[in-house]
UniProtKB/Swiss-Prot annotation:
Protein name as catalogued: Large ribosomal subunit protein bL17
UniProt family annotation: Belongs to the bacterial ribosomal protein bL17 family.
Protein species of origin: Methylorubrum extorquens (strain PA1) (Methylobacterium extorquens)
Stored InterPro entries: Ribosomal_bL17, Ribosomal_bL17_sf
SUPFAM superfamilies xrefs: Prokaryotic ribosomal protein L17
Gene encoding the protein: rplQ
Length: 138
């Protein structure tokens, strides 16, 4: 029996799961809307709700806690400068999950997770994999 266990394991180690949710949180803060599988979206919601609640109180301690969770300095800045003030008067429920059909290939249920009152212009194309520029000998 799995009574009292919260969350899913997603067939990943604890470190991998934490890194996955950190990356998904950073992507959601950056684009304000992402498409993922429904179970991942359901488990991401409490993570992002707690981060937005941290963003509502701008303090050094809150910034350090957010940085420990997200690990992306630019997204922490956006969290405290844009998202925190936007949801200052809202007591909770900062994001919504909408079902988006099934993925072709493995028929996994997909979902769109987005911020309530989101900025439509913030959603952009995926930046793709980042590469390190190498210094060429001139």
């Amino acid at each position: 029996m799995r009574h009292g266990y919260r969350g899913r394991r997603f067939n990943r180690t604890t470190e991998h799961r934490k890194a996955m949710f950190a990356n998904m949180s950073a992507a959601l803060i950056k684009h304000e809307q992402i498409v993922t599988t429904l179970p991942k979206a359901k488990d991401l919601r409490p993570v992002i709700e707690k981060l937005i609640s941290l963003g509502r109180t701008d303090s050094i301690h809150a910034r350090r806690l957010a940085m420990a969770q997200i690990r992306d300095a630019d997204m922490v800045k956006k969290l405290f400068s844009v998202l925190g003030p936007r949801y200052q008067s809202r007591p909770g429920g900062y994001c919504r999950i909408m079902k988006a059909g099934f993925r072709y290939g493995d028929n996994a249920p997909m979902a769109v997770i987005e911020f309530v009152d989101r900025d439509v212009d913030a959603r952009g194309k995926d930046s793709g994999p980042t590469s390190v520029e190498t210094a060429e000998a001139a």
